[in-house]
């Protein structure tokens, strides 16, 4: 009888010990889970990504952006990164941008070269500069590929944006943000590109043009933030194609706008559709026609839909200017 009582006591002690071990184990598991959760939350807080994925058509672009050094520089400060996404404060003004030239200078030089009041060389720093410009975008097909080509060559360009190309198109808006984020210049190519509205009877309608420019400015501000502004405009069809230029010139001066035309082009909007080799040849011909002293060239191209051959020709066009000793700059 005494032996049975002894066995029962030993059993109770063992059971109690076992329960204590179970409780300790549970406590350790819960503590580990809490600590692990805190570490994950802390790690996630310090690794905010700034990229956006409009849709599958620009996914390859997003992958390249996610691995860029610029993303790494802002990682770890979630409040600052989120602010940049909202107001695109990464878009630099002319004074802040080391890749930009003054729109007033570029506009004056280009105008003088076109109307014969200036002759090469026009720069005072001894450099040879080409300004790659793209009209009518952004497109969801060609603009992302053009951005990738420019990145590969570490070249910056100026994009003359159409308001109707981005209005109501979330993917195009994201591409515009990405264009600015990669350090390119954003300029105004009016909202509508409608010749009959802008130039009735082939005469510049100042009120309609200013209204169209301001409408485009408002749309771009909605996308890029209220701090965004651009002084650079380009008239659809160019400035010199229309009557009524005197009144338009006065309106531009009053509003602080600078029109920048072009003095070379790849002819991707001229005549029959051209392949990449023909676009390269057109570029060379229009550049060579400027003469051996040409030191400031504004090259017209397009990044809208249907300009896939422009994308294909762009690497060769960049290499052509590199071989001739040109520097690539933007216009702000």
Give the label of every model feature segment.
Residues 2-10, 19-132, 139-144, 152, ...:
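N-terminal pre-catalytic segment of deacetylase/amide-hydrolase enzymes
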